[in-house]
């Protein structure tokens, strides 16, 4: 969980201080956004190969690869914090490890947890991701203000190396007693795996929901500080507070919603609810004003929208089966991050049309309405206990 949190910490740490980075490194808004955008871009390229490695070698082998990239490149950033090319190369290096870590969560779950606890376990794994986001969005601005950019990168670099060492020292590949009935592992090729999962109607539809949900979240995470500042006059520090509270609320959602889902053996209603509440909250983000109103809106948005991630990952296992746990999650993440590669810069383009963020927010609200329609078409995946 700690290593997974680090990937999100490093993904968003520059987005939390994008105004500072633009002014001190003398670069454009797009160049600053690129420091975060390389993560979904790399995910698109490596997600499926990472998924196949997970299914063939197991979660420890895969996450170990990711932990090495994360630790090493987080330290390289310290060499020259004011060199944009070095920061970009380091971000690319860290992003290379992300698919191997995040796609391994569901494989870890099916290895260590019984089926009746799947959604809860995936929710706890997702919780780690949001802890990383909270620290990145909430703590980074304060660290830079008080200690400077280099000290912030040094602290995060030490955390990265510590994560790598702790993973290899403490994590075991399998539990002493299997959590569920063991099945003979059959090696599958990438092509065979994709053909198998893409024959399943509900999984294809779930892929479109993931495409929109993950893409929209990436867009909001990248530009929220600027949206709050330009639309509502909220300062960088206050915007960071709202962003971190939004993600913290999502952390609670990732624990509570999967617990309820496991208890009542239902997934589909929560997937529909996430997109529905998300669309409403994006409209409120366009029209609402003031710190308090946006804080409350952020709490509601985070709780429901972010809780969709563990629900989607659990549904992917239930639809495709344990055999394809790695590649099915890899495919969903590929679609979602592929959408992010398009949505993040497109939001900036739409912002340029009228010089404000109303148009890009309207765009993602429409996308969430489409996600609602798609989610309704999926059959319930949870089996009665």
Spans of features found by a protein language model:
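Extracytoplasmic gate region of multi-pass secondary transporters
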Residues: 14-15, 201-254
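Conserved MFS/SLC helix-loop-helix module at the cytosolic interface between two early adjacent transmembrane helices
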Residues: 45-83
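Helix-to-loop junctions at the C-terminal end of transmembrane segments
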Residues: 46-58, 254-266, 351-352
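Cytoplasmic membrane-interface "Motif A"-like loop-to-helix N-cap segments
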Residues: 56-66, 262-275
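Cytoplasmic helix-loop-helix junction between adjacent transmembrane helices
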Residues: 90-129
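Juxtamembrane intracellular "pre-TM" segments in multi-pass secondary transporters
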Residues: 174-206
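C-terminal transmembrane helical hairpin of 12-TM major facilitator-type secondary transporters
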Residues: 266-315
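A late C-terminal transmembrane helix in Major Facilitator Superfamily
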Residues: 317-356
